[in-house]
């Protein structure tokens, strides 16, 4: 099959709120293999997407296990992807996407929140250091990440610039998302586009 024009990657949310029969928090592995097979036959990479606003906190960054009552750590989720890939060698994920946005109402310009942003950058770095070499890493960021300067690896500059620097070195993709706290206006917009 030919590659789909203009589309080269799917970033698929794989988080399942309850443990599955695979002892993971991933969707059904057979259905996942079917999706990956279909995408790969069209020349499209598939990356498992995960995220949690708590991950940039110091106790969550690259710990192997969650810190109760927190969610699962990024390393546990990467391990599940690696475990899935081992069990389905013909239908492997091509990478992992970290979709770590701040909680609703988060103000990046507040001094205390700089630590969260610095933690986010540290999370990306330690994820890169522990991610299996055969998996790509993509990240999703807010469209407002340039509003405050933070310190990272010896320099102080806007968070977005640090992420761009990482992207130029090692990140597969940086997705810029315009998050919304409500769906106000969405129905009208969809109605206008469909009409």
Predicted regions and their residues:
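Aromatic-lined carbohydrate-recognition surfaces of secreted/lumenal glycan-active proteins
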Residues: 45-56, 117-159
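Active-site groove signature of glycoside hydrolases
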Residues: 11-16, 78-116
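N-terminal carbohydrate-binding/catalytic regions of secreted carbohydrate-active enzymes
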Residues: 1-39
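Active-site-adjacent "subsite" loops/lids of carbohydrate-active enzymes
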Residues: 32-37, 45-91
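Aromatic- and acid-rich polysaccharide-binding/catalytic face
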Residues: 7, 12-19, 93-94, 100-104, ...
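Glycoside hydrolase catalytic-domain groove-lining segments
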Residues: 117, 121, 125, 133-137, ...
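Structural preference for beta-strand elements that scaffold enzyme active sites
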Residues: 9-11, 43-49, 90-97, 134-140, ...
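Alpha-helical scaffolding within the catalytic cores
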Residues: 1, 27-35, 77-85, 143-166, ...
């Amino acid at each position: 099959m030919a590659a789909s024009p203009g589309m080269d990657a799917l970033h698929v949310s794989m988080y399942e709120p309850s443990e599955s029969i695979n002892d993971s928090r991933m969707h059904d592995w057979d259905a996942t293999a079917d999706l990956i097979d279909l995408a790969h036959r069209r020349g499209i990479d598939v990356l498992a997407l995960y995220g949690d606003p708590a991950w940039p906190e110091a106790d969550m960054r690259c710990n192997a296990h969650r810190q109760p009552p927190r969610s699962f750590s990024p390393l546990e989720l990467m391990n599940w992807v690696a475990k899935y890939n081992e069990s389905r060698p013909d239908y492997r994920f091509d990478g992992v996407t970290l979709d770590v946005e701040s909680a609703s109402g988060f103000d990046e310009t507040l001094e205390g929140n700089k630590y969260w942003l610095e933690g986010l950058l540290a999370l990306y770095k330690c994820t890169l250091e522990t991610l299996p070499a055969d998996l790509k890493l993509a990240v999703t960021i807010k469209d407002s990440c340039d509003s405050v300067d933070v310190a990272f690896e010896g320099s102080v500059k806007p968070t977005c610039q640090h992420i761009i620097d990482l992207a130029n070195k090692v990140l597969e993709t940086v997705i810029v998302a315009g998050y919304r706290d409500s769906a106000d206006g969405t129905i009208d917009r969809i109605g206008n586009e469909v009409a």
